[in-house]
A protein has these predicted regions:
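Flexible, gly/ser-rich surface segments that form the specificity/activation loops bordering the active-site cleft
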Residues: 121
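Conserved N-terminal beta1-alpha1 strand-loop-helix module at the mouth
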Residues: 1-84, 89-117, 146-147, 155-165
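Charged helix-capping and loop-helix junction motifs
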Residues: 44, 131-140
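Short, small-residue-enriched loops and turns at beta-alpha junctions
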Residues: 36-37, 125-130
Length: 167
C-alpha cells in the first residue's frame, strides 16, 4: 500500500538548533541516540521545537516514553525483534509506528509489530554494505503489504529520478 506523496525524515541524535534550522519545515524528525542514556532534556527540547514548527516528532525504540510524552509516534529499529513490542500498550489516537527493515523477514516482523510505515534499506549502493535492493527488488518486497514503505539508503542526485519508479 503506497501513497503518491513523499515523506522526508531526518534522524537526529541531539538538539542542535543551527542544524535543525537548516532542515525544511516539512521534514519529520526521529530522535535516535543510543549512546546517551540521560537524554530526556534533548527529547523535551526537540518536542517543543517540532511543536513550534508544526512537524512530527518520533522517538526511537522507547514506546513507553513516546506515549508518556505524547509524541507523534515511535520508531522501531530493525534490531528490535520483539514481536509483542507494541501490543502491551494502549496507543493514543493517531499514534504512528514506524519501523526499519532490510529484508522480507524483517518486513513481516515490522508488520507484526503494527508498523504503519517501514523504512526499507538500502535501496541503492552504499559504502557500508555490499548488498542493496534496487528498484525491482524494493517493488517486489513491498507488493501486497499493508504498510507505507519509505526508501532509505544510497539516494543521491544520480539515482534520484529512479525513486519515481518505486511503488
Amino acid at each position: 500500500m503506497q501513497k503518491n506523496s513523499f515523506k522526508i525524515y531526518s534522524f537526529v541524535n541531539e538538539f542542535n538548533l543551527s542544524d535543525l534550522h537548516q532542515l525544511s519545515k516539512d521534514i519529520c524528525i526521529i530522535y535516535r541516540n543510543y549512546d546517551n542514556i540521560n537524554h530526556l532534556e534533548n527529547i523535551l527540547k526537540l518536542k517543543e521545537y517540532c511543536k513550534n514548527i508544526k512537524t512530527k516528532f518520533y522517538l526511537s525504540n522507547d514506546i513507553k516514553l513516546s506515549i508518556k510524552l505524547r509524541l507523534d509516534g515511535v520508531y522501531i529499529p530493525s534490531f528490535n525483534n520483539k514481536v509483542n513490542y507494541v501490543q502491551n500498550y494502549s496507543l493514543p489516537k493517531n499514534f504512528d509506528i514506524i519501523g526499519s527493515a532490510h529484508n522480507i523477514t524483517e518486513i513481516n516482523l515490522k508488520l507484526k509489530q503494527k508498523c504503519n510505515e517501514i523504512f526499507l534499506s538500502p535501496v541503492f549502493k552504499v559504502n557500508k554494505s555490499k548488498e542493496f535492493l534496487g528498484v525491482n527488488r524494493f517493488n517486489f518486497m513491498t507488493l501486497n503489504k499493508k504498510a507505507y514503505f519509505i526508501a532509505l539508503g544510497g539516494i543521491n542526485e544520480k539515482n534520484y529520478k529512479k525513486i519515481k519508479l518505486l511503488r
